[in-house]
Each structure stands twice: as C-alpha cells, then as structure tokens.
C-alpha cells in the first residue's frame, strides 16, 4: 500500500532473486489509495514497460546521431517533467501527456495561468481546465479503456470531433470517422476529396 510498502519490497526481492533481469512495477510508486485501481495502474505500467524502453532508446539514438549533447526529459500526465530513466520505469505516468502538453503550452503562449483550454486533434477534441498553469487533475479514480485506475491524469472531457472528422449528408452528420493524419491529403482545402470539419471551420 502507499502507506506501508514493506510487503511489495519483499515480493520484489523474491522476484529479483529468481528473475534478476525482469522489469518489476511496484504499485505504491504509481497509484494512490484503492487496491484494485492501484493494481490496474501497476499492470498497465508493466504492460507499457518494454515499449517505453524501446521508444526512449530510439530517442537517445536519434539525439546522438544528430550530435546533440542534452539530457532527455518527457512530460508527465500532470504537466511536470521526468527523466528518460524515470519514464522507462514508469511509462504509465506519461500516458496522457499529449493533451497536458497542449494545456501547458496554452499557458505559456497566452500568459494565462487559469483558463479553459480546447485541444483540437484530428479525431477528437480534449477540453480541460488550467489552474495555476497546470491541468486540473482528475479525481481519485480514472477510467482508461473501461478499466479503473488511480494514477495522476488530467481532468479532461474528450469529444469525438476533430479537424479531420468527416462531414456527410449535407452537413447533418459529423464523424465518428476521421481522415486523421491524412488531413493534408484528403481534406478539400488541401485539394482532396473529403469534406472535413477543417473545410467548414
């Protein structure tokens, strides 16, 4: 538990004796109060671990090839930063950092520390509150794909409407499908053949 992690450390010690190279996620380092939610957060973190290591190694390789001598930091769900090694151990804490980056960027670019921010993507739009320059955090329990978890996440309202959402039936039906990242190829404004929200905005 977050209050007494002794049993988790004992379990980790036993695992390390048997499987010294295994990636081990301790739930008290990720989740908050709530056994099931914290367990789900730990399982999700463990599932993302190998992919996170691969992505971070690719970042490091690309930076080295460019001759850039700088540390790598990744943004967390709460708008703060973490080192590459921390992100490799706790990838679940970067899970929703895309909308968070938009919100933090809105604070920096606008000069407002308190605001309502709308992040319009290709398929969806995320709406959230910026308080003191950081996204407001969701309540204790957050559903991720229908699974209850309790790691830090921004409190967002996701709407199935984005710049690439397809418009049909003379404008009476929008989405749910989208041209997504093919917006510059398929939208009418770019010479394509699909009517999208970007075309009528």
What are the roles of these predicted feature ranges?
Residues 1-201:
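N-terminally biased helix-coil "hinge/interface" segments that flank
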């Amino acid at each position: 538990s977050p209050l007494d992690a002794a049993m988790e450390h004992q379990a980790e010690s036993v695992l390390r004796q048997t499987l010294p190279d295994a990636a081990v996620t301790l739930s008290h380092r990720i989740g908050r109060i709530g056994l099931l939610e914290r367990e789900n957060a730990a399982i999700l973190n463990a599932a993302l671990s190998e992919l996170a290591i691969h992505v971070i190694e690719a970042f490091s390789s690309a930076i080295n090839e460019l001759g850039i001598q700088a540390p790598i930091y990744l943004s967390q769900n709460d708008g703060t930063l973490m080192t590459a090694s921390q992100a490799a151990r706790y990838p679940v804490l970067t899970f929703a950092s895309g909308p968070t980056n938009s919100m933090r960027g809105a604070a920096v670019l606008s000069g407002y520390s308190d605001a309502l921010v709308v992040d319009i993507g290709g398929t969806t739009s995320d709406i959230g509150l910026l308080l003191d320059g950081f996204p407001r955090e969701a309540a204790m329990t957050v559903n991720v794909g229908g699974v209850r978890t309790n790691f830090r996440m921004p409190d967002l309202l996701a709407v199935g409407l984005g710049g690439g959402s397809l418009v049909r039936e003379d404008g009476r039906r929008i989405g749910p499908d989208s041209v997504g990242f093919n917006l510059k190829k398929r939208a009418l404004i770019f010479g394509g053949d699909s009517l999208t929200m970007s075309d009528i905005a």
